[in-house]
Structures are given as C-alpha cells and as structure tokens.
Curated annotation (Swiss-Prot):
CC terms in the record's Gene Ontology section: extracellular space; secretory granule
Protein name, as recorded: Vasotocin-neurophysin VT
Localization per Swiss-Prot or TrEMBL: Secreted
Glycine amide: residues bearing it: 9
Function in brief: Vasotocin is an antidiuretic hormone.
Sequence similarity: Belongs to the vasopressin/oxytocin family.
Post-translational events: Seven disulfide bonds are present in neurophysin.
UniProt keyword annotations, A-Z: Amidation, Cleavage on pair of basic residues, Disulfide bond, Glycoprotein, Hormone, Secreted
Pfam families assigned to the protein according to its UniProt record, in alphabetical order: Hormone_4, Hormone_5
Chain positions carrying an annotated carbohydrate: 117
Gene Ontology MF terms in the entry: neurohypophyseal hormone activity
Cystines in this chain: 1-6, 22-66, 25-39, 33-56, 40-46, 73-85, 79-97, 86-91
SUPFAM superfamilies named among the record's database cross-references: Neurophysin II
Amino acid sequence: CYIQNCPRGGKRSYPDTEVRQCIPCGPGNRGNCFGPNICCGEDLGCYIGTPETLRCVEENYLPSPCEAGGKPCGAGGRCAAPGVCCNDQSCTMDSSCLDEDSERQRVSPDQNMTQMNGSASDLLLRLMHMANRQQQQTKHY
C-alpha cells in the first residue's frame, strides 16, 4: 500500500515492517510508483494515467507500506523528479525539488540527452506554474 492510503491504523499498523521503496515502473523500470496512476523517475519525469503507470495499481494490493521519492515537499508529497512533487493522487511543480542538496542524485548530462539549459528549464517551470494556477482557478468546490 502507499503510505497515504494504507488500511486503518496507517503505516503504524505495521510496527515490525520497514517502509520499503514502492514498486518500479516506467520504461526500463527506471521510475517508481507514487500512486495507482503515477510513475516518476529522476531521468524520466512523471507519467500520469498512461500505460507506464498500469503496474502501479498492484501496489494497492501489497500489504506492507511503501514510500517513493526523495525529500518531503508540498502537502504530504515527496520529490519525484527535478522540480516535481507528487503524493499518491497528483503531482505539482515545486521549486524545492530542484534543490542541488536534495537526497536524490542529479542526472549527469551524458545520462540524459534531453536535459535543458537553465533558461529553457526556467521557462518550462514558469509555464507549468501558470498552467497549474489556471487549472486551480477553474476548479469548482
């Protein structure tokens, strides 16, 4: 189970069980499941509701708690990819996940040929923030 959706008693109902890494997913199993429909990896980014996430549903049926990602961020989330914070339900852009001192290793340019220069990365991050704000404004509660 994902730590956020474990059965009654939550992760504390498993006192003798260590929290394990959530199951791998995505191309070449280079990512980890963050929720039943979310697969993220340092060099993959995040897949949400795509075929790459199908395996993540299996985590709901495993009895021991798992936790994916790097350092805590956002509202109950963890850093999932550079600049991305995810919980078991959704992902948001989060600049704290760009921190050079994060618990996750940075991907070297020779491992990731799609890495952008600083200005392109900044522009993409700003566009994602604007899209996220616009999406939040259109939600009705």
